[in-house]
Amino acid sequence: SIQLFKDEMHGNRIDIDLENNMLETISIKGMGKSIYYIVDKTNLLMGYNKATGDTINLNYKGGNLNTLNIKGDARGIFYPEIGRTKIDSILNYKSSIINYEINEELTTLYENVEIEYHNTTLKSNNVTIDWNTNNLYAYADEKEESEIISQGQKPIAGRNLEFDLINKKGIIKLGKTAVGDGFYKSNIIYREEPNIYHMNKSIYTTCDHENPHYYFK
């Protein structure tokens, strides 16, 4: 059977630029909304993405969508086609800016990033999702660390974070978390399961200062 998909765009104003009778750019301003369908190289549906923001800019190359950029209260929801993609749950995300690189299958979120997947929430300054590998990379800034929160668990914060969306495992660099009345800090924290972590070069302390006065190593 043949599957037909129709991408949708809505907004208060839509500007379209053509070059040599080919679509070059589309700019959506004011309450921008877009729905686009994701297909593999055999044209099978892998899922669809809903996105909203103050402005949405779409850039085309050779008549095909190349990049999609959303600015201002950018939000998105990815709905996977169950059975055709390894992503097995809806993924919600929001940030100040979202940039989609269609051909490279990369999504990058900038500033005030929050992502919800299964029972896990990630907060960070910058996040890149590589859909080729289904890996997520979070990078903190100087003022605020990346933070991952699993349902029923204490938050874990760190400078950089790598997370596999398929097996739910991850690595947190320069991480820290609360356990009971104390705190663990570690150069690297490996997340094996939502409640199982392995730490490398770690310390334990009940002192809540950034540089604890005492600790066990």
Give residue spans per PLM region.
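Structural signature for solvent-exposed beta-strand/loop edge elements and short helix-capping sites
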Residues: 1-217
